[in-house]
């Protein structure tokens, strides 16, 4: 069972910046081929390390605020946040 969370701009602060454990954020889009290729690996990581790291996917087409804030210019882009 996957533990990957579908995030968005409105929950980014709580789910990512205020998380007690490290968070891997996948900035992606549904039309992106490489994003689709990396998705199964992220699913596996989310299961294997479910209590050690949180994985959140942010669709950049629908959620542009934090993609712009962190300078996301190509996708997929993976960023790790630890304690904000």
What positions do the PLM features span?
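A short, hydrophobic beta-strand/beta-hairpin element that forms part of a small beta-sheet core
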Residues: 23-24, 42, 65-66, 76-84
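Conserved redox-active cysteine motifs that mediate thiol-disulfide chemistry
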Residues: 27-41
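Short pre-active-site segment immediately N-terminal to redox-active cysteine/selenocysteine motifs
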Residues: 20-21, 28-31, 74
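Conserved helix-turn-beta segment immediately C-terminal to the redox Cys motif
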Residues: 20-22, 37-58
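Structural microenvironment flanking redox-active thiols in thiol-disulfide oxidoreductases
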Residues: 58-68
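Conserved Rossmann-like nucleotide-binding pocket used by diverse enzymes
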Residues: 8, 28, 54-56
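A short beta-strand-turn-helix
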Residues: 4-23, 64
């Amino acid at each position: 069972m996957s533990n990957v969370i579908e995030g968005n701009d409105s929950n980014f602060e709580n789910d990512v910046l205020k998380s007690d454990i490290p968070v891997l954020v996948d900035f992606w889009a549904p039309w992106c081929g490489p994003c689709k290729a990396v998705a199964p690996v992220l699913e596996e990581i989310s299961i294997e390390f479910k209590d050690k790291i949180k994985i959140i996917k942010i669709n950049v087409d629908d959620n542009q605020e934090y993609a712009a804030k962190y300078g996301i210019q190509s996708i997929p882009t993976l960023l790790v946040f630890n304690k904000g």
